[in-house]
Amino acid sequence: MSTTTQNRLESRYGGITITGTPHALSVWTIIALRFVMGGMILLAGLGKYAFVPGGDSFDAFGYLSNVHGASPVSGIYATMAESAVLLDVINVIIPLTQVLIGVALITGAFVRLAAFGGALQMLMFYLGGWEGEWLALFDSTLVYAVVFVALGAFAAGRIGGLDAYIEQIRVRGEPLIERYPKLRYLLG
């Protein structure tokens, strides 16, 4: 295995340029991170279905109705818990999106969309779990959200994933990503 290929990262923002040269093996770390996060959220989603061995029927009522008053989302979560229709929708959306995010990350397809969805879901869990203590400001849910953002930023789907192939599908003689450049925000 050759590790002589050098990667280069560069970003300019607000007049500041930051550059870096990560080790060539960093691509394997990104793939591993994509698989681990994909597996984690896939199993979390599957565990919310009663038909899965070891799974249990998911009900968000207990979580939404017991958010600590210091949480910035306590009011909106309590309102969600009071609406039977909205609660039914949430009970379907959370496990379904977790399964879809997991599959997307593991296969490397639509990784940026999946990473955004994962980060958003973790941020909502983080805000719902915060009880106002500053020592609990940085917990595992926030770390998960940041890792999802990193996977999207690194375009982890282009590294050993299906996004590298999806982007090159030819549509009317040109690669999909060139024909529809806005797809760069979903793929990668």
Report residues per predicted region.
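Extended, low-polarity transmembrane helix blocks
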Residues: M1-L100, T107-G188
